[in-house]
Curated annotation (Swiss-Prot):
<dbReference type="Pfam" id="PF02540">
    <property type="entry name" value="NAD_synthase"/>
</dbReference>
<keyword id="KW-0315">Glutamine amidotransferase</keyword>
<dbReference type="InterPro" id="IPR017926">
    <property type="entry name" value="GATASE"/>
</dbReference>
<keyword id="KW-0436">Ligase</keyword>
<dbReference type="GO" id="GO:0005829">
    <property type="term" value="C:cytosol"/>
</dbReference>
<protein>
    <recommendedName>
        <fullName>GMP synthase [glutamine-hydrolyzing]</fullName>
        <ecNumber>6.3.5.2</ecNumber>
    </recommendedName>
</protein>
<dbReference type="InterPro" id="IPR029062">
    <property type="entry name" value="Class_I_gatase-like"/>
</dbReference>
<dbReference type="InterPro" id="IPR004739">
    <property type="entry name" value="GMP_synth_GATase"/>
</dbReference>
<dbReference type="InterPro" id="IPR001674">
    <property type="entry name" value="GMP_synth_C"/>
</dbReference>
<feature type="active site" description="Nucleophile">
    <location>
        <position position="96"/>
    </location>
</feature>
<dbReference type="GO" id="GO:0003921">
    <property type="term" value="F:GMP synthase activity"/>
</dbReference>
<comment type="function">
    <text>Catalyzes the synthesis of GMP from XMP.</text>
</comment>
<dbReference type="InterPro" id="IPR022955">
    <property type="entry name" value="GMP_synthase"/>
</dbReference>
<dbReference type="GO" id="GO:0005524">
    <property type="term" value="F:ATP binding"/>
</dbReference>
<comment type="subunit">
    <text>Homodimer.</text>
</comment>
<dbReference type="InterPro" id="IPR022310">
    <property type="entry name" value="NAD/GMP_synthase"/>
</dbReference>
<keyword id="KW-0547">Nucleotide-binding</keyword>
Amino acid sequence: MQKERVIMTNISTLNDVQKIIVLDYGSQYNQLIARRIREFGVFSELKSHKITADEVRAINPIGIILSGGPNSVYAEDAFGIDEEIFELGIPILGICYGMQLLTHKLGGKVVPAGEAGNREYGQSTLRLRAQSELFAGTPEEQVVLMSHGDAVTEIPEGFHLVADSVDCPFAAMEDTKKNFYGIQFHPEVRHTVYGNDILKNFAFSICGAKGDWSMANFVDMQIAQIRETVGDRKVLLGLSGGVDSSVVGVLLQKAIGDQLTCIFVDHGLLRKGEGDQVMEMLGGKFGLNIIRVDASKRFLDLLAGVDDPEKKRKIIGNEFVHVFDDEASKLKGVDFLAQGTLYTDIIESGTETAQTIKSHHNVGGLPEDMQFELIEPLNTLFKDEVRALGTELGMPDEVVWRQPFPGPGLAIRIMGEITEEKLETVRESDAILREEIAKAGLDRDVWQYFTVNTGVRSVGVMGDGRTYDYTIAIRAITSIDGMTADFAKLPWEVLQKISVRIVNEVDHVNRIVYDITSKPPATVEWE
């Protein structure tokens, strides 16, 4: 019988913590709004647009932000809002679709896309037409990112115009008596030059935030909630060798001690020497109770002949839980499975309002007959926040700054069918890449880096002989939160050294290419 996910971060229980909630209307990047607010030291989290006024009262936020989204307020299936929320006396900021929704519900007028020729996509110059607390400290003209088809043509009673642009007569509006604000652009993205200032003004000047949220608060909150949720029952944690599951392990140990059993599944898709390193770091240094399971044959047999990336993820996710079932059957009274799911995993796997980019191993690969309830203590955090959490928990840099590693392991860094030969090329080339990046002192500057077996063979010459071997791609990116990323501009001499070493030291490889694609349009991983 399937059991439901346990939502570990329920901010309605944080009675002593100020929070600003963001209502989700479907933008793939609306969680960045919550992230920006958190950067100011104010707790924030995405909530469904279906939230009721009573639920908002229970959460007791100091502010509400209505996010952007792709819908029109005139669509039959348009996302709405419980209008009683407008009567709660809580400051509201509507962004893009959020501004249009605010206008539509409060008696203004929104013109559908194309009717007035007022579409705006890309950077635009915003012109302030009135003084506003929301724009305090920003210039009269500023560059913002617009992304809208529909537009406001009449603002509701009680509001006044704050800013416009060449193609948008009402780019910002406010009703200072009710503390309602609307902006047609996106302050959460870095293309809006003064976006952080605008969000900060809303949080502090308008909502009265104190900025006293910290990772220490998060640790205390999660430990308390884990203890309340788990009680005297037992938890299994799957260790993948990555940062996320390692941080979850230390957090759970602090919360419930020996009620935690960690299962480290060696699925045969790990990096070079990873299995022994996991046991030494987490079992030895931190004293976690770890059961190591060699299930490599089970996984590799199931993956034989499979080249579709989604099928790979599903197979690995399913088998991972089945291995857990097998191991859990040997233990008594285990009710929970803990995972290192991050906020970015949840968003990319699709929410109620946003489409799926790809299924994540911690989100979309679980079978319907799973026998555990899920505990996901990190599912409101971004990767850099997980590192900060690890530091707060006293974990050393060698663990906290370990390269991110997906649950499916090297399976999604091998294009096409997985073979032992391909696995070995990725293991060895990845080890060389990590070693040379560290030698160059770039391991803190480059957010993530790894190698990929592209599955492409090409002709080469080594010695006096012709070769026909694999092409290895190097992927290295810079990022802040993993939601957007640029390819890392690695020094040529470093790339050259990496390339020379790989083709000379790794069998069956004769060509190296460098991935210079940003995210978007690409994702970080190749599959």
